[in-house]
Amino acid sequence: MSPNDVEQQQLPTQNNNYNDNINSPSLNDDDEDSFFREIKEISRGRPKTRDEIQISDRTRLSRWDTPLTNDGVSPFSSIFKTLPPGLTDEQIAALILRLRVDEITKKITIGPIEFTERDRERSPSPPPTYDNNGKRSNTREQRIKEKLQKERHQLVVTAQQINPTYKPPSDYQPPNEKKTRKIYIPIKNHPEYNFIGLIIGPRGNTQKRMEKESGAKIAIRGKGSSRDGKPTKLQFQENDELHVLLTADTVDQLDKAEVLVREFLIPVEEGKNEHKRQQLRELAEMNGTLRERPAYMGNRSWTPVDIKCVQCGETSHPSSDCPLRSNESNQQYIESEYQKFIDEMSKSLGFDISISPNQNDNSLQNINLNNNNNNSNGNNNGNNNGRNFNNDTVGDMDESPPHHTQSHFQQNSPQFDQQQHQQQWNNNNNNNNNNNHNNNNNNNNNNNNNNNNNNNNNNNNNNNNNFSNYNNNNQSFYNNNNSPYGPPNGGSPYGPPRNTY
């Protein structure tokens, strides 16, 4: 047989087998379509992509692939293969969050990105946007990837709140979304109170200190936040009321900053504001004008006088203005103490000097006058050796002075008392004589003044007579000369003379 005959005999058999496979009941239309699709792709020479060939379908792994176990989990993964017993609800929730974070990380880094199977039911796509290089930046894959990243960020924040030691994936980067909060300043209720100065502090030190403690940024925004005439950047919150703007990454930082700021939004009286006093002290330290104590306290060579009221012991008022003086019982106590003092002085001096506190001032004046007269009239004191010459005769005056002088008498003796009474009587007589002499001098002065007044009156009368004679002479002069203008007032052509008297 020739080779051609052999080929002709083999062809029918192959066609028969092919027809049998097609007509067999085990093959469906879908299987047939997929079979022919694979045959065409293989015949074209294009290999299957990574998305088309699943990792689990591979029989051979490359050295870059991660070895898989029977349960499909990598041996290097931190996920538990089986849950240990005795876990709390928080631990189970943290484990579920970790599983979801790892799943999203795997989709973002390795893929594939899941698409919605129902394309007709999905929302319409947004208009396309392009970057500087002309590439589209909001493709469907990019939008799904951003959505997964946002979900992973929320899961990481929740996991860190449950377990502070949780470490996010290595490729995780938190978004730059800042949290803000407004705290309005009550400037309308207290327009004269300096809230901004208390919050900012000297050269911004108070503001910087609060930012360091809380970790949030503190700024003053709104109407009145900038000085008049100072160029500032236009802010979108300029038309808002005056407020404090807090900006932070977390809510805890905002809460800490709010507590620190609200302490300065409560008005305090001027003398009780300790925070303002500390700010002024800090500013003085910066300017170099701080004094630890007043200047007058340094070189003071005197001590203040500690004057207290005699009756109540207070330093707020003198004894004369004490409110306890109007009290009757207290007044009686003062009088009794005064009387005790007078009695003690009378015993020590040997004679009675009792003067009640309510006595008139006339007695005190008489005592002072008597003392002055005693000092002026020395002939009645030590010069005369205590003798009284009013009742002495001529023979008595020639006698020698007595042996006993004033200094030799006892204070309690009757001679001493008689001498004191005689001396007081002499002083009174001298006072009367002096008063009479002064009265005579006053009368003489009055008479002289009256004489002077009479002389002045006589001089004035003489001046008036001279002036009248002068006017009469001028009148006769004008009458004789027949002046067309007539005599002026007073008779003089230049008017009446000036009275210089």
UniProtKB/Swiss-Prot annotation:
It holds the Pfam family SF1-HH. Residues 1-14 have a biased composition (Polar residues). It comes from the Eukaryota. This is Branchpoint-bridging protein. Necessary for the splicing of pre-mRNA. It comes from Dictyostelium discoideum. Residues 194-261 form the KH domain. It is found in: Nucleus. InterPro entries: BBP-like, KH_1_KHDC4/BBP-like, KH_dom, KH_dom_type_1_sf, SF1-HH, SF1-HH_sf, Znf_CCHC. A zinc finger (CCHC-type) spans 307-324. Keywords: Metal-binding, mRNA processing, mRNA splicing, Nucleus, RNA-binding, Zinc, Zinc-finger.
